[in-house]
Structure formats: structure tokens, C-alpha cells
């Protein structure tokens, strides 16, 4: 094992002076974390402040909220502030707000009702700041508006209601589309596009000059319907017949929603349908839309084929409506991620460019691409990855971004000039740390957020001087003082090397009173999905994993291992799992467990694994290997067969069933011997109202195991009535975590020998499965 760090107390490089001394959360007191402090969510945690930067003539202005709820305009340059919205003008119970670009009005969302992961319904109101008047966006609204957004330059608001698009302007509303309904979505995504493609609730984009609106129309006609029953439906007395929610949910190889591209001239209300010919209609996914001009000359979309291993960037000239493929790529060695990173740059040496991230070289890096097509210009390179573009400053010709240059578990903030190609760190990039930043509208200032591994903080900087902060935004001094009362888990990060040569990142938590001469139970806590990352230098949440490490009756060591297929270690590392999800990932977890057992303190009779969602699937696949290393497992909301999951996620990694039938059969959890041979127990938890990973997965998995001969002393299935993927309905999470705590406690108490079995149970098992029950 190559030790990378222990709380990362690294030396300080001379190039960049750090904003403050490291403040490691080492505790120093005698208190141990308790269940109530950690579960179901961490109560001892860092605070962070989210600032709404304002795009005005003067850079460095942002909105903050006072203790009484008033909205304050802060000016960094003049160090002054002004109350824009008094506390008594703030609607009670509002959910969110957005300022008009000229700060003369505020758009409020109230009466929030959650729909899916990102989408919600609400009422919207417009507050005229000067007059103090509050006007409904739609006079007859009934908590049914799906999305609303200010134009970047004028008084217009685009909004979606009943899946139809509307334009509001100075109190006058124009309905743009008339065909919205259960199967037609204008300007908002359907379920699968929201969940798997955009990761957001809108599908409309104003041009920079506000004169045009690009939007997508989704047609779900013919997409199969999945029905979710709600047994209680938030009622005190359950209805005799459950409410049934019908969702158009395309599973693997089923019909996908089709998508159309539309342009709207806002002044004339003239709408144009732009033919999308990058791929056939039934083989098309639109992943991104971006304006490639400072006005409205050109707009582009990113098109994928159905299985997302081929990509075309198509530019549309707005006036002529002509389309042109300006870039394409073959990614059939794996898949192509939809990074949503296109941004217009403008003129560079007499030619117009846009910026994007691509991993075509094997590592994700920043490139300039000509707007009209042509040879790209690489701005970053190396065996590390750009994680995100934070800001493009066209005046200074700088792109700000975060990367893994120091190590795949870290994040540092840099700028790169697209004039000189010089890359400059904004932080000390010679130490293991996790940073991000939020830049002002014109790029002159930024909030630097240090997120770990030490106690997080936020500070304000000018881009002219990254060495000296202008002010502290969030110090978390109170958290640091609080932590001094505690004796905390000892966290370390290291790598283990596979026989094939790849290295896996590991995060280890040891009990606060760890004694290397004692034996400790261990719980592996993977997620492990494609492109994901669990092992990072971000703040170690004092959650359930920290609790089971701290409780004197439990004292578990936890290992989190990022297996092959996870993110930020290059395309080859990610793509290794293509067409066979769960195979290499499970091998890697087993290998890591065997490496763990080289430690004398690891109790080989009490090695568990627990995961949620993809992690629950990986838990089952790991136990399925029948390695004998793991003695118990817990799968929360798991996929059990990817033929039961949605098409746009699954086919990206597995292709269609027609192309990869054997791969799907092997990926499904289907072998039972590993479960039958467990020394301990296997627990499945799932919410019956899960609209993402359907309860069907848990039902099929438990049936497979029961029919395969897994006995009642080895298997428990726990459902949570009406709960979604997060298991939060009606205090379900409280029960869930108590069950988890009981499970790990019982497994620690379990002795290696088989518990006694009643004679009746022996006879029944023998009759059912033809087994000879041991005396």
C-alpha cells in the first residue's frame, strides 16, 4: 500500500500563500459521536454560504440575506450594502427567488411541490421593487407552473405550465405552444431526460441578447408506462385503492422519447422547427444546447446516438435555419459522457471559438473548438482530468476550472489563458485539498470554497490577487471549537495496486480509540458506479459511517474503495467496465477486502459490505462472487437486473439487449451460492414508491434468493411504504438507520459457528430444497 496522507497535513508551497493555516478536525476531547448526532443526517457539519452574483455594469455585486430575511445588495468594490427587498416584502414560505438583471424586480417561487429529483411545481410571483407590488405570473395559477426564467436583457419571462411554453412581458402573456400534455413536453424534460441527461428541470435557453429562445420538445408517445402504487398517499387512513402514478419510463431496449429542436423569435412569436438529422429519430439523444454567439447568430446542440458512444456537435445559423455538423467523435471503446460544458469564447486571432471538455485523448481536458468547425486547440493536457469549467472571462482571455492535477481525490482551482496557454493555480496546488470557486458575473472576484479534508471555510478574493482574501465569508470557527470536544474517527487515504497494474483509491476510518492489537469488524461502503467518486479529500461527513466507527459497542473500521469504472482516473480506467457492469467492480471490492485482511487487526469473521443504489447493486454482485471474504451485506434501493432500469443510463454503459444479451444476463444478480454460504446475514431495503430504481428490483432479487435456497436465517427484506429512492417518507429514514445499526451490531455479536436451528425449520428446509439440514 502506498500511503498518500493522514488528514493531509502537507507542507506549504512558496508560490501561493494559503489563506489560512490548516485546521484539521482531529478533535482532542473525550466525547464520542452519538447516534442522534450522526443519523439520519449529520448534525455536526460545516456551514456554507451560497451567494447570488449580480450581472450589472459594476462587477463584484451579489445578493445576500440578512438574519430577518431581507435581501441585501452587497458591493465588494465600495464595501457598501443596500437593502433591495425589506423583510416584510419577502413572501412567507417562499422556495426560491431570481432577480431581474436590472435589479428592478424579483421572481419568487412559492407553494413548492416536489415532482422528481430536480423538478417541482410552484406558484410564481413578480415583486416590483420600486412599487412594492406583488403580481402573480399567471392569474389562475394553482401551484402548477413547472419552470420560469427571466430573459437576460429585458422584461420577459419564459415559463412552462401544463407542458406548454409561455412568454410573459410586462404583464402580458403569450402562449407559444398548444400541444403540451401528458405525452408532449415543451421547454421542460420528461422523466428520463431530467434524471439521466440534463440533471435539471428545464430545456429552454435564451440567446445572450434575449431576442431568441431555443427549446426542446419531447414526445413520449409509445414509451412504455411504469405504474407506482402509493399505499398511504400521505393520508392518515390508507385509501382502499392505492393511488397509482403512471410514469413513461423507458427501460432497456424499449422505445425512448423522441426530441425536436425549436427556435422562437420572441418579438414576433414566430416559431421554427429545426430538423435534427445527426442521428435517426429513434437513435437520437440531445445532451446539451448552447448559444455560440454573443447575440443570436448561432446556436448548437450536442447529439448522441442512442447508446451514447457516438457524438455530433451541430451548429444552427439562426437567420437561415441551416444546420452543420461542426464536430463528431467515435467513442465505441466505451461511452461518451455528457459534461454540459460548451461555452462561447468569441474571437481568437480572427476566428470564433467555443470551449468544451473532452476525454478523447484518454483524459478529460479543455479544448477550443472553431464555431464553424475545424482543428481544435488543446489548452490543458496530462494524465489528470479537468473536472469542471467554473468561469470564462473573455475580456482577460482566461478560463477558470477545477482539476485533479495533484491527485484524483483532490480538486484545485486554476486559470488557463487561451491567449498564451499559461496555466496558473489560484490555490496552493502542492497539497492534498478539495476546492471549488464561484466567480462574479464579469470574473473580477470569486468566492473560494475550501471543502476539505480540514475544516471548510469560504473566502472572497479578487482575481488580481489570489494570495490575500478580501474577507471571510464563512469561517466555521464554531464548528472547529465544537469538534475540540470530541474524539473523532481517524481518517486516512491510500492506494492499493491491482495485479493488472491499476491503483484503487481507499478511504479508511479507524475508531477513535483504535488499538492495533485488538480485532475490529469492518464495513465496506462502496458506490462504485460509472464515473462516480466516493473517495475524495472533501470534508469527512460525521454521518452513519462515522457513528458506527465511534460507538464503543460497534467500533467498526470502514473502508470505501473506488473500483474500476469510477471517475477522474482517465478514460481507460472508466471504460474498463463497459458492457459488463458489476463484474470488475465486484472483483475489485473482493481484492480490497483481501488486502484489508493483511492487517492483523481486521476480524476475518466480521467483514461486511453496504451500498445504496448502484452501491446496493455492487454489494449484491460482490456477495454473488462467493469469495468467502465478506460475511454479511446490506443492499439499499439496489438495481438487481439492469434490464429493469432506464434506457438512457443503462445503454450508455451496457448497450442494448440486442447488442449485448449475454452481458445483461451476467450483470443481473442471479447466482445464489454466495448468499447461501454467508457466515452472516443479507439485508435488502427498498422504498415501494421509488420512481428511479423501482421496487421491482428488490422484489425480483428477494425472489431469486428465496427460490434459490437462501434460508430465512440468511435473508431479510425490508420495504418502506411509499418512500422514494432516498427513503424519506413518513420518518422512514429513522427506522431505516435503526435497522442498519441493529444489523451491524448483530453481525458483530455473531459467532463464527452456525446458530442452533429448530427441528421444524430443518425439516421444512429439507423438504423445500432437498438439503440435509445439519444437526
UniProtKB/Swiss-Prot annotation:
The keyword Cell division does not apply. Glycans are attached at residues 81, 111, 170, 219. The active site is at residues 613, 690, 725. Its EC number is 3.4.14.5. GO terms for molecular function: aminopeptidase activity; dipeptidyl-peptidase activity; serine-type endopeptidase activity. It catalyses: Release of an N-terminal dipeptide, Xaa-Yaa-|-Zaa-, from a polypeptide, preferentially when Yaa is Pro, provided Zaa is neither Pro nor hydroxyproline. GO terms for cellular component: extracellular region; plasma membrane. Residues 1-15 form the signal peptide. It is an enzyme of class 3 (hydrolase). InterPro entries: AB_hydrolase_fold (IPR029058), Pept_S9_AS (IPR002471), Peptidase_S9_cat (IPR001375), Peptidase_S9B_N (IPR002469), Serine_Prot_S9B/DPPIV (IPR050278). Keywords: Aminopeptidase, Glycoprotein, Hydrolase, Protease, Secreted, Serine protease, Signal, Virulence. The keyword Acyltransferase does not apply. GO terms for biological process: proteolysis. Pfam families: DPPIV_N, Peptidase_S9. It is found in: Secreted. Extracellular dipeptidyl-peptidase which removes N-terminal dipeptides sequentially from polypeptides having unsubstituted N-termini provided that the penultimate residue is proline. Contributes to pathogenicity. PANTHER family: DIPEPTIDYL PEPTIDASE 4-RELATED, PROTEASE FAMILY S9B,C DIPEPTIDYL-PEPTIDASE IV-RELATED. Belongs to the peptidase S9B family. This is Dipeptidyl peptidase 4. The lineage of its organism: Eukaryota, Fungi, Dikarya, Ascomycota, Pezizomycotina.
Amino acid at each position: 500500500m502506498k500511503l498518500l496522507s493522514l488528514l493531509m497535513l502537507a507542507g506549504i508551497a512558496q508560490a501561493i500563500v494559503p489563506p489560512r493555516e490548516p485546521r484539521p478536525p482531529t478533535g482532542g476531547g473525550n466525547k464520542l459521536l452519538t447516534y442522534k448526532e450522526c443519523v439520519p443526517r449529520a448534525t455536526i457539519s460545516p456551514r456554507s454560504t451560497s451567494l447570488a452574483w449580480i450581472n450589472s455594469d459594476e462587477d463584484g455585486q451579489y445578493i445576500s440575506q440578512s438574519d430577518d430575511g431581507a435581501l441585501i445588495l452587497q458591493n465588494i468594490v465600495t464595501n457598501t450594502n443596500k437593502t433591495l427587498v425589506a423583510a416584510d416584502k419577502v413572501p412567507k414560505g417562499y422556495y426560491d427567488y431570481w432577480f431581474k438583471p436590472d435589479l428592478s424586480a424579483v421572481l419568487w417561487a412559492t407553494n413548492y411541490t416536489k415532482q422528481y429529483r430536480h423538478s417541482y411545481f410552484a406558484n410564481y410571483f413578480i415583486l416590483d421593487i420600486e412599487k412594492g407590488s406583488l403580481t402573480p405570473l399567471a392569474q389562475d395559477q394553482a401551484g402548477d407552473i413547472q419552470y420560469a426564467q427571466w430573459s437576460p436583457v429585458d422584461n420577459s419571462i419564459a415559463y412552462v405550465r401544463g407542458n406548454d411554453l409561455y412568454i410573459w412581458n410586462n404583464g402580458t402573456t403569450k402562449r407559444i405552444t398548444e400541444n403540451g400534455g401528458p405525452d408532449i413536453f415543451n421547454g421542460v424534460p420528461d422523466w428520463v431526460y431530467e434524471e439521466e441527461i440534463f440533471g435539471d428541470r428545464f430545456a429552454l435557453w435564451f440567446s445572450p441578447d434575449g431576442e431568441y429562445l431555443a427549446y426542446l420538445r419531447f414526445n413520449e408517445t409509445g414509451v412504455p408506462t411504469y405504474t407506482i402504487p402509493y399505499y398511504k398517499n400521505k393520508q392518515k387512513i390508507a385509501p382502499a385503492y392505492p393511488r397509482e402514478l403512471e410514469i413513461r419510463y423507458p427501460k432497456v431496449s424499449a422505445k425512448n422519447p423522441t426530441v425536436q429542436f425549436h427556435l422562437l423569435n420572441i418579438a414576433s412569436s414566430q416559431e421554427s422547427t429545426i430538423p435534427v438529422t445527426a442521428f435517426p429519430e429513434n437513435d437520437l439523444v440531445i445532451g446539451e444546447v448552447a448559444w455560440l454567439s454573443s447575440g443570436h447568430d448561432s446556436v448548437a446542440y450536442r447529439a448522441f446516438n442512442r447508446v451514447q458512444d457516438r457524438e455530433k456537435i451541430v451548429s444552427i445559423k439562426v437567420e437561415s435555419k441551416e444546420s452543420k455538423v461542426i464536430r463528431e467523435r467515435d467513442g465505441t471503446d466505451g461511452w461518451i459522457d455528457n459534461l454540459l460544458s460548451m461555452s462561447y469564447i468569441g474571437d481568437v486571432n480572427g476566428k470564433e471559438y467555443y470551449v468544451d471538455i473532452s476525454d478523447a485523448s484518454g483524459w478529460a481536458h479543455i479544448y477550443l473548438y472553431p464555431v464553424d468547425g475545424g482543428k481544435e486547440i488543446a489548452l490543458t493536457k496530462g494524465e489528470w482530468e479537468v473536472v469542471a469549467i467554473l468561469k470564462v472571462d473573455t475580456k482577460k482571455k482566461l478560463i477558470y476550472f477545477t482539476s485533479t492535477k495533484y491527485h484524483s481525490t483532490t480538486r484545485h482551482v486554476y486559470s488557463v489563458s487561451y491567449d498564451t496557454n499559461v496555466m496558473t493555480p489560484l490555490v496552493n496546488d502542492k497539497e492534498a485539498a478539495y476546492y471549488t470557486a464561484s466567480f462574479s458575473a464579469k470574473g473580477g472576484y470569486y468566492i473560494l470554497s475550501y471543502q476539505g479534508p480540514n475544516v471548510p471555510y469560504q473566502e472572497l478574493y479578487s482575481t488580481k490577487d489570489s494570495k490575500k482574501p478580501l474577507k471571510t465569508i464563512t469561517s466555521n470557527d464554531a464548528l472547529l471549537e465544537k469538534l475540540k470536544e470530541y474524539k473523532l474517527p481517524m481518517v486516512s487515504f491510500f492506494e492499493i495496486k491491482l495485479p493488472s497494474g491499476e491503483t484503487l483509491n481507499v478511504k479508511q476510518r479507524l475508531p477513535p480509540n483504535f488499538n492495533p492489537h485488538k480485532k475490529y469488524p469492518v464495513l465496506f461502503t462502496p458506490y462504485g458506479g460509472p464515473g462516480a467518486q466516493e473517495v475524495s479529500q472533501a470534508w469527512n461527513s460525521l454521518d452513519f459511517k462515522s457513528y458506527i466507527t465511534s460507538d464503543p459497542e460497534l467500533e467498526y473500521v470502514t473502508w470505501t474503495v473506488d473500483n474500476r469504472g469510477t471517475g477522474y482516473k482517465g478514460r481507460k480506467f472508466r471504460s474498463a467496465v463497459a458492457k459488463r457492469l458489476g463484474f470488475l467492480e465486484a472483483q475489485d471490492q473482493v481484492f480490497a477486502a483481501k488486502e484489508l485482511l493483511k492487517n492483523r487487526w481486521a476480524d476475518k469473521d466480521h467483514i461486511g459490505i453496504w451500498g445504496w443504489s448502484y452501491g446496493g447493486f455492487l454489494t449484491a454482485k460482490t456477495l454473488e462472487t462467493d469469495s468467502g471474504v465478506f460475511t454479511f451485506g446490506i443492499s439499499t434501493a439496489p438495481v438487481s437486473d439492469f434490464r429493469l432500469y432506464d434506457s438512457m443510463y443503462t445503454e450508455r454503459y451496457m448497450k442494448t439487449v440486442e447488442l449485448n444479451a449475454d452481458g445483461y444476463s451476467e450483470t443481473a444478480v442471479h447466482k445464489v451460492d454466495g448468499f447461501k454460504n454467508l457466515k452472516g446475514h443479507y439485508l435488502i431495503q427498498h422504498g415501494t414508491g421509488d420512481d428511479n430504481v423501482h421496487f421491482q428490483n428488490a422484489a425480483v432479487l428477494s425472489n431469486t434468493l428465496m427460490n434459490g435456497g437462501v434460508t430465512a436465517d440468511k435473508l431479510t427484506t425490508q420495504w418502506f411504504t411509499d418512500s422514494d429512492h432516498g427513503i424519506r417518507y413518513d420518518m422512514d429514514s429513522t427506522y431505516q438507520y435503526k435497522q442498519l445499526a441493529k444489523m451491524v451490531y448483530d453481525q458483530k455479536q455473531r459467532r463464527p459457528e452456525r446458530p442452533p436451528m429448530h427441528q421444524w425449520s430443518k425439516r421444512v428446509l429439507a423438504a423445500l430444497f432437498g438439503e440435509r439440514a445439519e444437526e
